[in-house]
């Protein structure tokens, strides 16, 4: 029994505890959907707690928030790759949002570097955004055009923020978070990781 339990992910065991299967005995499909949704929430909460807990302990909270928000701001409309395994996702999150802020926190940037970097980012948004995944194909040409337009507008807004912010080191962190998102939508990344690109073509 203990060997079986050890092989069950913690998030699944927690979901089993939080959801009473007896209440869903007449709706197995509904139970599985709710359980899966709860597992996703628990995984994200635990990952968030781990990343930000380490950032807090190491004195990197502001740096982590800056990189993470910049990344999420662009990802909202440009989408991009997701790790296929929870462990990989957690490790990548630690590298991106803890290790990278630690490495780049004291590196200043001027506005010429900001303009050059965000020019590159804007070009990538124009060429490659939005990028979908096997589990989340972005169906509909007009929908994709709208997302691309919003991703480019979001890039311009973030460029303005990076230019106006008075802290040279924070400019660097904003660019780091933004470049992480560029990596996640670039077709070369898909190719290197052997992931399918333009998944919507399978449905159109």
From Swiss-Prot:
The keyword Nucleotidyltransferase does not apply. Keywords: Cell membrane, Hydrolase, Membrane, Protease, Quorum sensing, Transmembrane, Transmembrane helix. GO terms for biological process: proteolysis; quorum sensing. Coiled coil: none annotated. The keyword Hydrolase applies. Its EC number is 3.4.-.-. GO terms for molecular function: peptidase activity. It is found in: Cell membrane. May be involved in the proteolytic processing of a quorum sensing system signal molecule precursor. Belongs to the AgrB family. This is Putative AgrB-like protein. The lineage of its organism: Bacteria, Bacillati, Bacillota, Bacilli, Bacillales.
């Amino acid at each position: 029994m203990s060997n079986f339990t050890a092989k069950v992910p913690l998030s699944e065991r927690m979901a089993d505890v939080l959801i009473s299967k007896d209440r869903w005995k007449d709706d197995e499909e509904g139970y599985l959907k709710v359980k899966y949704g709860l597992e996703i929430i628990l995984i994200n909460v635990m990952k968030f707690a781990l990343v930000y807990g380490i950032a807090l302990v190491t004195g990197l909270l502001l740096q982590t928030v800056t990189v993470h928000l910049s990344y999420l701001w662009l990802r909202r409309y440009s989408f991009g790759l997701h790790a296929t395994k929870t462990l990989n996702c957690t490790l990548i999150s630690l590298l991106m949002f803890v290790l990278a802020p630690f490495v780049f926190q004291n590196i200043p940037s001027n506005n010429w570097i900001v303009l050059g970097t965000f020019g590159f980012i804007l070009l990538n948004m124009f060429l490659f955004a939005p990028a979908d995944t096997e589990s989340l194909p972005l169906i509909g040409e007009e929908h994709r055009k709208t997302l691309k337009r919003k991703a480019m507008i979001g890039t311009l807004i973030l460029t303005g923020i990076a230019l106006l912010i008075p802290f040279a080191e924070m400019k660097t962190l904003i660019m780091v978070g933004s470049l992480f998102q560029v990596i996640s939508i670039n077709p070369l990344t898909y190719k290197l990781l052997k992931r399918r690109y333009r998944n919507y073509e399978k449905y159109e």
